[in-house]
Each structure stands twice: as C-alpha cells, then as structure tokens.
Amino acid sequence: MTNIQTEAQMETELLKQLEQLGYQYVTIANEADLLANFKLQLERHNKIAALSDREFDQILNKLQKGSIFDKAKTLRQKKDYTRDDNTVGYIDLIDMFDFCQNTYQVTNQVTIDGKYQNRYDVTILINGLPLVQIELKRRGLELKEAFNQTNRYERHSYGAGYGLFQYIQLFVISNGVNTKYYANSKISARSFEQTFYWTDTQNNQITQLKDFTYQFLDTCHLSKMITKYIVLNESTDTLMVLRPYQYYAVEEIVKRVKESDENGYIWHTTGSGKTLTSFKTSQIITSIPDIAKVVFVVDRKDLDYQ
C-alpha cells in the first residue's frame, strides 16, 4: 500500500525544515498571543524601550486602519506615535533596504474568531507580523482547494480584531507535490490563474514543497521577494508579485548595471509582463546610490498609463 503523507505530517515536516532555515518557532494560539509577540518583536526590531500599553494601543489603532492594499503601504512606511512623555517616536515594521536584517518566526494552527472561527495551517512572521500564510492540503487533493480556503479566511476572520492577518503579503499553497505562490489582494482581484510555480534559472518548475521551501522560503530570499518584488498597483489597489522569469530578468539587469558599462537586453514574449519587469527594474535601479537618473521609455501611450 502506498504511504500517503497526511496534512499533519506535511505540516510537521515543513516546520522542521523552516527551523533548519533559521526560522524561530513560536507558539501562538490566538490574537492575544500574536499581539504579545508582535509587541516584543517591534521593540527589538526598532531597538526601543518597552512600549507602554497606551503607546502600543496607539500603534495598533494606526495599523488596524485601511484595506489590504492600504496595509501593504503601511508595512513599507515609517510610522509615528506619541510617547507617554509627549515626544514623538517612530517605528519601522520591516527593513526594506537591508532586507535580510529582519526577524523570522514561524507558527502554526493560530485560531482567530471572526464571522466564523478559523485555524490557519502555517504562518510566517517577519518582525512579529504575519506576512506569509501557507495553506496545506494532503496529497491527492486539488491545489485550488487550498486557494479557496485562503479566500474563506479573508471573508471570515483575517479582518477580525486588529486585522493583523490582512498584512499578509504572500500566500503559499501546496499538496506536497504541487506548490504555488501568489500575492495577497482584495478577494475580487484574486484568481487561481494568478498563482505561480517557482522555477530555477532554466525555467524548470519547482513543484515539491520541500524543494520550494529551501529555495523560495529561504529567509533572505523571502524578504527580498516581499520588499523588492511585490508591486503596489495604485490604479487597481492590488498587489502584484513577479513571476520567476521576471525576477531573474530584473536580477540580471540590475547586476549588469552595477558591474558593467555595457548594454544588454531581455527577451520576453507577448503577454509575459514586459512592462512590469521593466518598471520593477527601473524602480530598483533608482535606489542604487551611484545612479543619478533612470529613463523609462515606452512605445505606446497606453503603456505609459499602465
């Protein structure tokens, strides 16, 4: 008889693997535990003294406001709060520049009470905030079941309490043999067609959860994807994550800019997201200190708007 790995076994193996990659396992049963851990990580990340209850409540009230898209912008901004002595303090939620210099934790089976009670499989926390949700299904089940499950979480419980689960940037769905990722957004903008397999540089799909974890969920790579390779589309209020071939193209262009004065080009087919690749490349290059100006040229007016 074939030994079919259960969902619970898959979850246990994933947690062990993530700990090997440098994630700290933390027990978080509910929102109260989540908030207590977030407060501690926020203080450590910003190297500040312990926040008073009043100060922390201020911060939580600011973080609670807005849609998924608004919270994605908040994640990337410095936030202010009034200290008990009436001076102004500032906090960062994530290091956008030295993206490896963040704190990585993992937990599982967090239960949140909203319209319905939901218990999530595996949650990756960066500086105490839940930024990646991994939904697992046992081998043999369709991957779309995991996709639909994350949509139910959004409808039923992600916005409950202080709504910190709406800070999720990426979802990972897997049945062990097929594994895909996609960006968080409002439910009306989500589509199973916009879930992607990760690949290597030769475009070989990495479908097994174990292999995907080693490559995509490596702490530095994951935070690079979140800080560098998610685009906030203001025209549609949605988050867009680059596909692997776009990621590798941008990485090579940026490398060429940093290391050489020679020209180069990237070849993409129609409908492959060339404009997004070009935009993200330009955005990253503008952050290089030695680059004074980046000229972004399009050949049609509709691309300029896009």
Language-model region placement:
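ATP-dependent helicase/translocase motor core
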Residues: 2-298, 302-306
